[in-house]
């Protein structure tokens, strides 16, 4: 038995009256061991698509095991009734999506990943995200997927087919160019270097991409070197645009406590600097926000990258007119 095989573990996920054993794979070579949830519960959801304005979205999972120290989805405002790492699985998501898409009068882009990453560890065996992509393809809709994980490459065949039949956009988050820092702030997902490799692979397949350069964590990754390195990587990978919300961080009840606990563990004394500067503010702009935003705008403009959230989201959500009309004999 190899060391990798020896490190593989099985964890028990509770489904109410049932218990399902799912194999969590070992860490990839050179990566830290994944610290995954020990519990996961399955639900029969009543609906799957949310949103308005012609851009519906879905979250197959609710909660996440990536462990990002800054995650806004931990906020009390989202009213989780279970621990964030006790991931809720909407086991009937593909069937609900099939019903919802067949009821629509016009095709559109379908988004996933805004609340919880669709490619966390359990997706390797549950394959619910893949099944939903199959439904999107079969019904002729477009798709946009937001993730931090290289597990998306498993579904490259579907992404390619969706992009050729309608439109597919992959949105990838790049927070810090420093892989060592990445393993602290985003501990249970592949490092930035690997995500950049994914962007290049997608470019080779002519699948368009957008990068989220957010959040910018005051006193951690808010440097010109970091922003420049990420933007240069975006240019080299041929991304269409970069999303930035002003070079800072937002904290609310729920995620603030988690973030500060992580600072205490990994960066002793830094929490005190945050409290002294920001108090309990919701928006925490970097002290260098103005300079970093100017740098961001300059590099994006020089390289033809979409740089405002409005421009990026507008382009992502746009499905060419020839794909939106549903014919009498469409499936």
Model-derived segments and spans:
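Auxiliary Fe-S-binding modules of radical SAM enzymes
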Residues: 1-44, 225-331
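Surface-exposed amphipathic alpha-helices with a cationic face
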Residues: 160-163, 199-205, 297, 301
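Acidic-and-aromatic substrate-binding clefts and catalytic sites of carbohydrate-active enzymes
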Residues: 89, 151-153, 218-221, 250
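Conserved strand-turn element in the central/C-terminal portion of the radical SAM core barrel
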Residues: 177-179, 186-188, 201-223, 246-249
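Short, electropositive alpha-helical surface patch
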Residues: 126-129, 160-172, 221-238, 263-266
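Alpha-helix N-cap and loop-to-helix initiation/capping positions
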Residues: 85-89, 124, 186-194, 222-226, ...
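A structural motif
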Residues: 140-141, 207, 239
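Conserved Radical SAM active-site core
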Residues: 22-171, 175-183, 192-196
